[in-house]
């Protein structure tokens, strides 16, 4: 049993909870997720099973797309709806669509972001949420993130009320804290804010409409059709730049042979496939030999090599 399961993560579960539950359903220990989703967030969570755990690190590097809701009027300890209220300030003026769109435009591009205290980022060997739960504030590292697209989904021209909510879509780089973006939006509009709802609709090429629920996985497990919920390793990696090698080269790949970067791809890594469209290995740019590639992860051995 191996491959990638596109789980439609339910609300209220951590990513670790999802892995634990899937281990019980599939009766498989080698399972790992491809990036943390907060308990309040639902949506696309790719989970690697069996030999596919070898490729988890390559699936986490993909851009993510979310649809969510920002609420102005109060902020929380966790920057989302699950936290305790920290600051309250009624929205005492009309906010226009143009104002919000201008803020979203300002937050598009390369930004600096400080991760929230309630997060899994480690400082001095401890996760930030461990400090937060102990009532300790520590200096947090600044991250460089990229917001590729930030769109207002609400079609109203004006927003009024003590608490104002509006929906958005954002496509961003790995490591972006979208709930922190909600706080940043509030700051620029002059009011405390938090993320009141969030759904991950895409992780790289993986889309929400392709995801399956725990119930569907359990049903397929009982019916003996569980393989239908898996995406193969080859398919999961097929969207990345690739080099196709012949039989002679394929035989040498498993021994870590260097390759020429024949396609001149500038991406961090390049996949290597045989002529039967089977992924043999994942390569990266050689740090000392320009134009050459060296193996990062070999996915085949003598028994697994399929030619």
Swiss-Prot record:
Gene Ontology MF term list: RNA binding; tRNA pseudouridine(55) synthase activity
Broad EC category: isomerase
List of catalytic residues: 38 (nucleophile)
Keywords per UniProt: Isomerase, tRNA processing
InterPro entries in UniProt: PsdUridine_synth_cat_dom_sf (IPR020103), PsdUridine_synth_N (IPR002501), tRNA_psdUridine_synth_TruB (IPR014780), TruB_C (IPR032819)
Top-level taxon of origin: Bacteria
SUPFAM superfamilies registered for this protein in UniProt: Pseudouridine synthase
Catalytic reaction list: uridine(55) in tRNA = pseudouridine(55) in tRNA
Signal peptide: none
Enzyme Commission number: 5.4.99.25
GO biological process terms on file: mRNA pseudouridine synthesis; tRNA pseudouridine synthesis
Family: Belongs to the pseudouridine synthase TruB family. Type 1 subfamily.
Role description: Responsible for synthesis of pseudouridine from uracil-55 in the psi GC loop of transfer RNAs.
PANTHER family associated with the record: PSEUDOURIDYLATE SYNTHASE TRUB1, TRNA-PSEUDOURIDINE SYNTHASE
Annotated protein name in UniProt: tRNA pseudouridine synthase B
Organism this protein belongs to: Bacillus cytotoxicus (strain DSM 22905 / CIP 110041 / 391-98 / NVH 391-98)
């Amino acid at each position: 049993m191996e491959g990638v399961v596109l789980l439609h993560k339910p609300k209220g579960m951590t990513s670790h909870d999802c892995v634990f539950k899937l281990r019980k359903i599939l009766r498989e220990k080698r399972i790992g997720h491809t990036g943390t989703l907060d308990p309040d967030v639902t949506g696309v969570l790719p989970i690697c099973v069996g030999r596919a755990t070898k490729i988890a690190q390559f699936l986490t590097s993909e851009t993510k797309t979310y649809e969510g809701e920002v609420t102005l009027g109060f902020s929380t300890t966790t920057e989302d709806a699950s936290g305790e209220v920290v600051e309250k300030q009624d929205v005492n003026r009309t906010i226009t669509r143009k104002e919000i769109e201008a803020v979203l435009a300002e937050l598009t591009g390369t930004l600096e972001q400080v991760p929230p205290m309630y997060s899994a980022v480690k400082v001095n060997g401890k996760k930030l949420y461990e400090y937060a739960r102990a009532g300790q504030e520590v200096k947090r590292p600044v991250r460089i993130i990229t917001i590729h697209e930030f769109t207002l989904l609400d079609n109203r021209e004006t927003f009024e009320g003590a608490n104002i909510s509006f929906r958005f879509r954002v496509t961003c780089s790995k490591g972006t804290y979208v709930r922190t973006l909600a706080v940043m939006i509030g700051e620029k509009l002059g009011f405390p804010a938090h993320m009141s709802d969030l759904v991950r609709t895409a992780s790289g090429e993986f889309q929400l409409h392709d995801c399956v629920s725990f119930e569907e996985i359990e049903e397929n497990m009982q019916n003996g059709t569980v393989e239908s919920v898996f995406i193969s390793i080859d398919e999961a990696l097929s969207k990345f730049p690739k080099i196709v090698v012949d039989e002679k080269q394929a035989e040498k790949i498993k021994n870590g042979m260097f390759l020429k970067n024949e396609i001149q791809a500038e991406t961090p890594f390049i996949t290597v496939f045989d002529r039967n469209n089977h992924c043999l290995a994942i390569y990266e740019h050689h740090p000392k030999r320009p134009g050459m590639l060296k193996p990062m992860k070999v996915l085949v051995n003598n028994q697994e090599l399929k030619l």
